[in-house]
């Protein structure tokens, strides 16, 4: 029975994570995999070529060798493993799964700060730092989403937590109180 995309990503992501952690190169491998992901997203033809069933193994290996020369032995070995087992089509999913494991280990979370106006980097950092401190995390990376309909304040969504400090929500609560009192 064939594995689903999620199962392949989970297995290979966990294998890479375990290998990098055991060899004490986790941070370096993480950095390289994030760079690789950016490059592959910018140039999706790389995955197309390396997962093309028509191309022979030698041509794929030659192509991969040209790409991987800037990476560590660990990442090179992993990329060769993906090529050998014909898993290159799953590369971005594998990297994403690896990143989830890395973030969990390092108490890093990502989320969204929805505001009525755009926040600058310093404001986002302070919001993230405050959330991280409150929820015992090392780092919270926030992306700013602008939604003028919330009127003001901020809605923070990080992992499974939502903190709605928007003016719209506060007005809604006040309205509900007034209606309940009458």
Swiss-Prot record:
It is a peripheral membrane protein. InterPro entries: ATP_synth_OSCP/delta_N_sf, ATPase_OSCP/dsu. It holds the Pfam family OSCP. The keyword DNA-binding does not apply. It is found in: Cell membrane. GO terms for cellular component: plasma membrane; proton-transporting ATP synthase complex. GO terms for molecular function: proton-transporting ATP synthase activity, rotational mechanism. Keywords: ATP synthesis, Cell membrane, CF(1), Hydrogen ion transport, Ion transport, Membrane, Transport. F(1)F(0) ATP synthase produces ATP from ADP in the presence of a proton or sodium gradient. F-type ATPases consist of two structural domains, F(1) containing the extramembraneous catalytic core and F(0) containing the membrane proton channel, linked together by a central stalk and a peripheral stalk. During catalysis, ATP synthesis in the catalytic domain of F(1) is coupled via a rotary mechanism of the central stalk subunits to proton translocation. This protein is part of the stalk that links CF(0) to CF(1). It either transmits conformational changes from CF(0) to CF(1) or is implicated in proton conduction. Belongs to the ATPase delta chain family. F-type ATPases have 2 components, F(1) - the catalytic core - and F(0) - the membrane proton channel. F(1) has five subunits: alpha(3), beta(3), gamma(1), delta(1), epsilon(1). F(0) has three main subunits: a(1), b(2) and c(10-14). The alpha and beta chains form an alternating ring which encloses part of the gamma chain. F(1) is attached to F(0) by a central stalk formed by the gamma and epsilon chains, while a peripheral stalk is formed by the delta and b chains. This is ATP synthase subunit delta. It comes from Lactobacillus helveticus (strain DPC 4571).
């Amino acid at each position: 029975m064939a594995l689903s995309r999620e199962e392949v990503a989970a297995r290979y992501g966990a294998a890479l994570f375990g290998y990098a952690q055991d060899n004490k190169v986790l941070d370096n491998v993480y950095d390289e995999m994030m760079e690789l992901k950016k490059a592959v997203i910018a140039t999706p033809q790389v995955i197309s070529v390396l997962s093309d069933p028509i191309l022979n193994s030698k041509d794929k290996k030659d192509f991969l060798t040209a790409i991987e020369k800037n990476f560590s032995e660990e990442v090179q070995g992993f990329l060769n493993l993906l090529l050998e087992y014909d898993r290159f089509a799953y590369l971005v999913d594998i990297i994403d799964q690896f990143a989830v494991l890395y973030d969990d280990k390092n108490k890093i979370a990502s989320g969204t700060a929805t505001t009525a106006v755009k926040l600058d980097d310093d404001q986002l950092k302070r919001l993230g730092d405050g959330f991280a401190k409150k929820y015992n995390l090392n780092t919270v990376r926030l992306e700013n989403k602008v939604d003028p309909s919330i009127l003001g304040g901020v809605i923070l969504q990080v992992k499974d937590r939502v903190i709605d400090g928007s003016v719209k929500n506060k007005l809604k609560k006040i309205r509900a109180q007034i209606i309940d009192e009458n």
